[in-house]
């Protein structure tokens, strides 16, 4: 019989070790694998929610109806525009500046200044600007004033989205006009004391500016076409009476339409 303090044989130690059951290892591996699908389940749930946000359905008339998009905070980025001012419009711009900058600053939330050295009006967005098209509207407003339109007419570009400015030269209509013939064409468009121009404006619901050999027309797309047709007819030499008759017909059609 060995002493109580004697070392045990190696064979006894090996016989006392209990091997790990393979089933237990497989069970541990299954537990580790099951950890990943829990995260995938969250991803699937998030993708399902995003799919619900962009869900599309068809209404009774067969038109697609989308769920409204959520408002996301847009990144603030400074954008600038420069509107060149002709030399002959610099003095009117300075005189009417107290009436020009309030709509740009208060309505569009833009930063604006006159650069005397470069003879331009500089526009810049601020952190208070919410309309993405504010910079373009401000540029159109200032450009309309530099072309010769009144402030009240130019402000309409800020309030209405369907107004445009179309510009063309008299020689674009008839390239052979020179000297006195060109002067007579300009006189036919303007009329005595501007009566012909006012008649075209009232009939076509537009505003017309005659700047030397250039014609600028402000209004809606269809109205601009009507006004341009009358101006082109006068340039080509049509009698004013015939042009007035055509304008009356156009005005009657517009009245019936609206």
Curated annotation (Swiss-Prot):
GO MF entries: rRNA primary transcript binding; unfolded protein binding
The name this protein goes by in its record: Pre-rRNA-processing protein pno1
Keyword entries, A-Z: Cytoplasm, Nucleus, Ribosome biogenesis, RNA-binding
Chain spans, region Disordered: 1-26
Gene3D superfamilies: K Homology domain, type 1
Gene source species: Emericella nidulans (strain FGSC A4 / ATCC 38163 / CBS 112.46 / NRRL 194 / M139) (Aspergillus nidulans)
SUPFAM superfamilies found in the cross-reference section: Eukaryotic type KH-domain (KH-domain type I)
Places the protein is found: Cytoplasm; Nucleus, Nucleolus
Ranges where the KH domain occurs: 179-231
PANTHER family (UniProt xref): RIBONUCLEASE Y, RNA-BINDING PROTEIN PNO1
Gene: pno1
Family membership noted in the UniProt record: Belongs to the PNO1 family.
Quaternary structure and partners: Component of the small ribosomal subunit, ribosomal RNA processing complex (SSU RRP complex).
GO biological process: endonucleolytic cleavage in ITS1 to separate SSU-rRNA from 5.8S rRNA and LSU-rRNA from tricistronic rRNA transcript (SSU-rRNA, 5.8S rRNA, LSU-rRNA); endonucleolytic cleavage to generate mature 5'-end of SSU-rRNA from (SSU-rRNA, 5.8S rRNA, LSU-rRNA); proteasome assembly; ribosomal small subunit export from nucleus; ribosome assembly
Pfam families assigned to the protein according to its UniProt record, in alphabetical order: KH_PNO1_2nd
GO cellular component term of the entry, any: cytoplasm
CDD domains tied to this protein: KH-I_PNO1_rpt1, KH-I_PNO1_rpt2
InterPro entries, sorted: KH-I_PNO1_first, KH_dom, KH_dom_type_1_sf, KH_PNO1_2nd
SMART domains, A to Z: KH
Function: Required for small ribosomal subunit (SSU) synthesis. Has a role in the processing of early nucleolar and late cytoplasmic pre-RNA species.
């Amino acid at each position: 019989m060995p002493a109580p303090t004697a070392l045990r044989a190696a064979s006894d130690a090996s016989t006392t070790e209990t091997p790990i059951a393979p089933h237990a290892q497989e069970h541990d591996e299954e537990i580790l694998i099951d950890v990943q699908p829990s995260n995938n389940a969250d991803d699937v749930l998030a993708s399902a929610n995003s799919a619900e946000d962009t869900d599309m359905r068809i209404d009774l008339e067969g038109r697609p109806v989308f769920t409204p998009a959520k408002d996301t905070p847009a990144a603030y980025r400074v954008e600038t525009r420069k509107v060149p001012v002709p030399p002959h419009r610099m003095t009117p711009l300075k005189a009417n500046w107290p009436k020009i900058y309030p709509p740009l600053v208060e309505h569009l939330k833009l930063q604006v200044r006159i650069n005397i050295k470069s003879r331009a009006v500089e526009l810049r967005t601020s952190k208070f600007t919410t309309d993405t098209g504010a910079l373009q509207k401000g540029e159109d407003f200032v450009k309309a004033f530099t072309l010769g339109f009144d402030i009240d007419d130019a402000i309409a570009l800020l309030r209405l989205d369907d107004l445009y400015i179309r510009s063309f030269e008299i020689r674009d209509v008839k390239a052979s006009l020179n000297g006195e013939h060109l002067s007579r064409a300009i006189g036919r468009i303007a009329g005595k004391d501007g009566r012909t121009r006012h008649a075209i404006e009232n009939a076509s619901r537009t505003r017309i500016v005659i700047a030397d050999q250039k014609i600028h027309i402000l209004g809606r797309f269809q109205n601009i076409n009507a006004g341009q047709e009358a101006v082109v007819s006068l340039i080509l030499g049509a009698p004013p009476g015939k042009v007035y008759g055509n304008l009356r017909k156009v005005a009657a059609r517009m009245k019936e339409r609206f």
